[in-house]
Every structure is written in structure tokens, then in C-alpha cells.
């Protein structure tokens, strides 16, 4: 009878508590919420990780990346 009580307690109380997700266990949602306020060009830089080489760069209508590199550090 004691074994049955321990088994029921484990599956009816402890197992559901272990499977609950707390708010702190979801960092991906907070990260996505922070990134949704950025404009699409800034998000593309995060996705691609960088810029083209200056020697192979196209004029600014095509390549926004090099145009941003030409800005003063205070304007970025």
C-alpha cells in the first residue's frame, strides 16, 4: 500500500510540477520582443553578421551597409 501511495504521489504531484514552465524559462520570447522594434535593415545586419568588402561594394542604392560605415561613429 505504501508503494502505491509513493507512486501516485510521484506521478500526480511531482511530475506535473517538474513539467511546468516558468516565465524565466523562456528567454527566446523576450529576445524576440526586443528585436521587433528594429527596422528591417538593422535586422538583416544581425542575420548576415556583417558587411561586404569595400573593394567589391556596389553604390549606396544597392548596398546600405557601406553607406552606414561612412557615417560618423556618433551617427550610427
Curated annotation (Swiss-Prot):
GO terms for cellular component: extracellular region. Disulfide bonds join 51-65, 52-63, 57-66. It comes from the Eukaryota. The cysteine framework is III (CC-C-C-CC). Classified in the M-1 branch, since 1 residue stands between the fourth and the fifth cysteine residues. Its main location: secreted. This is Conotoxin Bu15. Keywords: Disulfide bond, Ion channel impairing toxin, Neurotoxin, Secreted, Signal, Toxin. Pfam families: Conotoxin. Expressed by the venom duct. It comes from Conus bullatus.
